[in-house]
Amino acid sequence: MPTVAVFDMTGKKTGEMDLNAAVFGIEPNMTVVHAAVKNYLANQRQGTQSTLTRAEVRGGGIKPWRQKGTGRARQGSIRSPQWTHGGIALGPKPRSYNYSLTKKTKRLAMLSALSAKAAAGEIIVIDGLDMGEIKTKNFVGFLNAIEATGKSLVVTPEVRVNVVKSAANIPGVRTTIASTLNVYEILNADKFIIDKAAIEKLQEVYA
């Protein structure tokens, strides 16, 4: 059973917490994790890319020269794809890149990501992760106290406005809540900073 240290907001260690092995102690399935990350990134795409076909480019309605007798190749429009400033043949058009994974796959990917973080020792549990006021300087001090360098993901059980706003302008720091956690955010962070209550919530859902 994995065990992690528990800290308070001053960075002082207050104890230890045993993590549920069914959630934080499985053998990570990296194939499923890859599928989940690929799915997340695909679903983030706007899909608004667009090019003009020969029918949509302005001009080119008249045949540039007669069909025969000039010695040049026959042409029907100066907006054909082979012309400079012509339309694009088979170019991208607006589309949705969204697709879904099965519940079983998404669940296994989440457990694999959490277990990988636990195995790497990158989970930092905070007892009472909250801010008394909106103060970026104080939140930076908190991160320094727990030695959270690099990219950090801060997870709370519910939206805590003071935490969200205090961390908003800190480069590399993202905030989220336990119910909207996703595999990409977990793996993209160097440190997984989570409220003790949020850990319990995750274990309740996934155990």
Task: Cite the ranges covered by each PLM segment.
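Extended polybasic, low-complexity segments that bind anionic RNA or targeting/receptor surfaces
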Residues: 1-46, 91-207
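A short, flexible low-complexity segment enriched in Lys/Arg and Gly/Pro that occurs
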Residues: 31-68
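Glycine/serine-rich anion-binding loops at beta->alpha junctions
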Residues: 54-90
